[in-house]
Amino acid sequence: MGKIIGIDLGTTNSCVSIMEGNTPKVIENAEGARTTPSIIAYMEDGEILVGAPAKRQAVTNPRNTLYAVKRLIGRKFEEKEVQKDIGLMPYTISKADNGDAWVEVRDKKMAPPQISAEVLRKMKKTAEDYLGEEVTEAVITVPAYFNDSQRQATKDAGRIAGLDVKRIINEPTAAALAFGLDKNEKGDRKIAVYDLGGGTFDISIIEIADVDGEKQFEVLSTNGDTFLGGEDFDQRIIDYIIGEFKKESGVDLSKDVLALQRLKDAAEKAKIELSSTQQTEINLPYITADASGPKHLNLKITRAKLEALVEDLIARTIEPCRTAIKDAGVKVSDIHDVILVGGMTRMPKVQEKVKEFFGKEARKDVNPDEAVAVGAAIQGQVLGGDRKDVLLLDVTPLSLGIETLGGVMTKMIGKNTTIPTKFSQTFSTADDNQPAVTIKVYQGEREMASGNKMLGEFNLEGIPPAPRGTPQIEVSFDIDANGILHVGAKDKATGKENKITIKASSGLSEAEIERMVKDAEANAEEDKKLRELVDSRNQGEALVHSTRKALGEYGDKLEAGEKDKIEAAIKDLEDVLKGSDKAAIDAKVEALATASQKLGEKVYADMQAKGGAEAGAEQAAAGAHAGAQAGHGAPQDDNVVDAEFKEVNDKK
């Protein structure tokens, strides 16, 4: 059985980890970085760039470069959070037929899980390159405060990427696993995981206990805000720059998509710099132009100014902390350790506020960018049966219930209930001779169902005629370890029942997921063909170069006819190298290799005559051997070709 990898699918950055024995290993991607920007670019020629290459070209291709898509996953178009993002994002967010928020790229509508799948596919490939084997199973993390629709959509993204998602695990819980397993402290400890990432905020109170040599991680409570994170901090800086520039030059940059993309990059850099310096300068020449000519942007921002701009955002994280402490039934003084997760927790003001609330310094021995992926890998090891000394007890973040008479939300499973869990309750009909009941399932904390998120509905039909209140209908709720809900309803008199796995009131249908999986496979086939074409092109160019070099040195030793034949073969190969026909390139490579055999023999004979066989090896390669190898894909050239291929990609 292959390894189960751990993936932190982040709003801004993603990370992949595996376990080597009992040691976690965060894997570097093809660009050599341990985290990958969650950015996807759709190019004009159909190529899809993911990560750093996508980020590098964002300024020139803002409408087709997607970032922060996790903020849309599992959400309806009409939700106020989505509406807020529509005005801020350079790309188009549109309404799908099922009411979900989708994205439009190059005249094509795409679902957020389909886009996130591109990032997951890169994470999968990163792990496969390192392990040297195919990876098919993963544990993927989500914010603890993600609702059922968002969890289901994340699982769908995994499937589209070709992964069997063994478990969806909450990010703070994963970070606690990463923290707790390498600590040798004995006895029970309560920890707070404060997770402020690129797009979401979570706080979890977790108890780590030693039970018969086994470490038990029990989540006592969780709270958060799935629309608060580093992207919002960046936006405050962008708005400030736009305002200052307008005051100074009279030009409004908010409608200039290219300028906005440059501002976003500059804002993110400034925010990061201000975590370690007191002042930074934003310098963007030629940001725009008007009738008077080009305009340049130059602005100094101090740490104090940034803190003033985002003060209320940081304050918004404290109320969920208060609620989580109360729900866990503990006091702030009971917390042994505070762990900071997510890139935004590097901001000194955030650390100060956390210290102020919890009354203690946060631990500095946890990597905020990598802890979540490491925890996911540990959970993967547990699920794979390779680790028996860990037990993880997570919770459902929000209450679940059904709508009953008068539009009331009758809660079946309360928030912070340990999962997996089951619960059933008996209900009856509201009208005489009612033949069917509609079960509407909601998630949230409001008293009235309409104030909560509707997850789905289904009917139980064929109820025998009876006065209202007589039929006995048992409704059962079952939450699995992924936090995904299964609901059933049964008429006790007839034994008739109906069950559903809640597939959000919208979400992707099975057929849509299958289509996206097929699309992804087709893309992979296209990528493979493109890669093979580039390989052939590189080999062809290398052969032209080496043959020309040998011809310059030894051409005078050939008969005129032989030399003409080689030069004609070089020209033929150069002509086909301009095109995209792999078969034609391969054929001309073979033809040049054959034509230059005589040249190779001359080179070799000359070297032997001089007794310099070693020195001649390189030149001999220009003849028959180099030609033949290039024609048949020389294995020793693979690494060189890889590097050249990436370089080509990055410049697109």
UniProtKB/Swiss-Prot annotation:
Keywords: ATP-binding, Chaperone, Nucleotide-binding, Phosphoprotein, Stress response. The keyword Signal does not apply. Residues 611-634 have a biased composition (Low complexity). Residues 610-652 are annotated as: Disordered. The modification Phosphothreonine is found at residue 200. Residues 643-652 have a biased composition (Basic and acidic residues). InterPro entries: ATPase_NBD, Chaperone_DnaK, Heat_shock_70_CS, HSP70_C_sf, HSP70_peptide-bd_sf, Hsp_70_fam. GO terms for molecular function: ATP binding; ATP-dependent protein folding chaperone; unfolded protein binding. Induction: By stress conditions e.g. heat shock. It comes from the Bacteria. Belongs to the heat shock protein 70 family. Acts as a chaperone. PANTHER family: HEAT SHOCK PROTEIN 70KDA. NCBIfam families: PRK00290.1, PRK05183.1, prok_dnaK. This is Chaperone protein DnaK.
